[in-house]
Amino acid sequence: MNGKYYYGTGRRKSSVARVFLIKGTGQIIVNGRPVDEFFARETSRMVVRQPLVLTENAESFDIKVNVVGGGETGQSGAIRHGITRALIDFDAALKPALSQAGFVTRDAREVERKKPGLRKARRAKQFSKR
C-alpha cells in the first residue's frame, strides 16, 4: 500500500478486523478476496457497505480488510466497525452521522459462558415432578 491510507480496527463477538481505506474506486477486498466472494449472505455484504452508503463514500475508497475469528455475522460486524473508525480517521465531521446510525459504538454482546450443572449457559435439565 503506497500513499496515504486511513486505518480502523473493528471488533464484534470474537472477530477482529483491520481496515485500510485508500482513495480509489470502491473495491472492497477481504482477506485477499472480493467482498461478494468472501461473504455468502447478502445481509453480510449489506452490513459491510452500510457506513459507506450512509456517508456517500461508496465509490471514493478502495478498502483492504484483514479479518480473523468468529463467523460470518461477527466478521461482517467487525468490518463495519473498522470501516466506521477509518472513515472517522479520514474526516471527523462524519462522526455525528455515523453515531446516529449506531455504527461507532462497539457492540459489547458476547457469548455467555456455560455454567456447571446446566446443559448450556441457561438451559437446565428437564425437571420431572414424578
From Swiss-Prot:
Family membership: Belongs to the universal ribosomal protein uS9 family.
PANTHER family cross-referenced by the UniProt entry: RIBOSOMAL PROTEIN S9, SMALL RIBOSOMAL SUBUNIT PROTEIN US9M
Keyword annotations of the record: Ribonucleoprotein, Ribosomal protein
GO-annotated biological processes: translation
InterPro entries named among the record's database cross-references: Ribosomal_Su5_D2-typ_SF (IPR020568), Ribosomal_uS9 (IPR000754), Ribosomal_uS9_bac/plastid (IPR023035), Ribosomal_uS9_CS (IPR020574), Ribsml_uS5_D2-typ_fold_subgr (IPR014721)
Magnesium in keyword set: no
Molecular function in Gene Ontology: RNA binding; structural constituent of ribosome
Name used for this protein in its record: Small ribosomal subunit protein uS9
Any Pfam family: Ribosomal_S9
Keyword set includes Ribonucleoprotein: yes
